[in-house]
Curated annotation (Swiss-Prot):
Disulfide bonds: none annotated. It comes from Dictyostelium discoideum (Social amoeba). PANTHER family: INTEGRATOR COMPLEX SUBUNIT 8. This is Integrator complex subunit 8-like protein. It is found in: Nucleus; Chromosome. One of its GO terms (cellular component) is INTAC complex. GO terms for biological process: RNA polymerase II transcription initiation surveillance; snRNA 3'-end processing.
Length: 198
C-alpha cells in the first residue's frame, strides 16, 4: 500500500513497470540518427550532422570497438553518406564532403562530384583531410588543380600520399581493403572529434 496516495500496487504490476523501464532505452544511436533525419529535412544541416555523428558514435562506442565500427559503417554510414555529404557541402566544408563522397560506392560519381567541388572551392580545401583520401583519381585531380595554382605545400602533401605504397591500386585486395577500412575508421574519429567537441 502506498501510504501517500493510498494506492495499492500488487507485485505483478511492479514487475510490469520494471520490465517497461527496461524496454525504453534512449541511448540507442538509431534514435539520434532519426532526429538527424528530421533536422536534415528541415534544412538544419549543422544539427543534422551532429546527430548523425553522435548516433553513429554511440553505435560504435565512439569508434573504439572495431567490430561495431565495421557493422555501423555498413549499416548506417554507407546509407547516410549522401546526407552527410550534403551537410558538409552546405556547411562550406568542401574537403570533408570530398572524403565522404568516396563512400558513395560509384567511383565515376565520386569523381564527378568531387571535381566540381575542387574546381569551385580549391582555395578552401583543408589539408588535414588529404590523408583520408584513398581513391587515386581524386588525388590526381587534386594534384592537377594545385599544380595549376602553383601551391607547393599542397602539391608536396599530395605527392607524399600518392607515393605511399599501401595506397597502390595493384596491391592485393585484402591489403587495400584493410587500408580503406582503417582510413574510414580514422576519418570518422577525426570528424566526430572536430564536430562534436565544438
Amino acid at each position: 500500500m502506498n501510504k501517500i496516495f493510498g494506492v495499492k500496487i500488487d507485485s505483478q504490476q511492479k514487475k510490469r513497470q520494471q520490465s517497461n523501464k527496461n524496454l525504453t532505452v534512449f541511448n540507442n544511436g538509431r534514435y539520434l540518427i532519426y532526429i538527424g533525419d528530421i533536422h536534415f529535412d528541415r534544412k538544419f544541416h549543422r544539427e543534422a550532422l551532429r546527430y548523425y555523428l553522435l548516433g553513429c558514435g554511440l553505435e560504435t562506442a565512439f569508434y573504439s570497438d572495431p567490430v561495431k565500427t565495421s557493422v555501423t559503417n555498413s549499416k548506417y554510414l554507407t546509407f547516410l553518406s549522401r546526407r552527410i555529404f550534403d551537410c558538409f557541402y552546405f556547411l562550406r566544408a568542401p574537403m570533408q564532403a570530398i572524403v565522404v563522397s568516396q563512400f558513395f560506392g560509384n567511383l565515376n560519381q565520386t569523381c564527378l562530384v568531387s571535381f566540381k567541388i575542387i574546381q569551385e572551392e580549391y582555395y578552401q580545401l583543408d589539408t588535414n583531410y588529404f590523408q583520408y583520401i584513398w581513391e587515386l583519381p581524386l588525388l590526381e585531380i587534386l594534384l592537377t588543380t594545385f599544380t595549376k595554382q602553383k601551391d607547393l605545400k599542397k602539391i608536396y602533401l599530395i605527392n607524399q600520399i600518392i607515393s605511399n605504397p599501401i595506397i597502390n591500386e595493384n596491391n592485393h585486395p585484402d591489403i587495400r581493403k584493410n587500408f580503406i577500412k582503417n582510413t574510414k575508421h580514422n576519418f570518422w574519429k577525426a570528424i566526430s572529434s572536430n564536430y562534436l567537441l565544438q
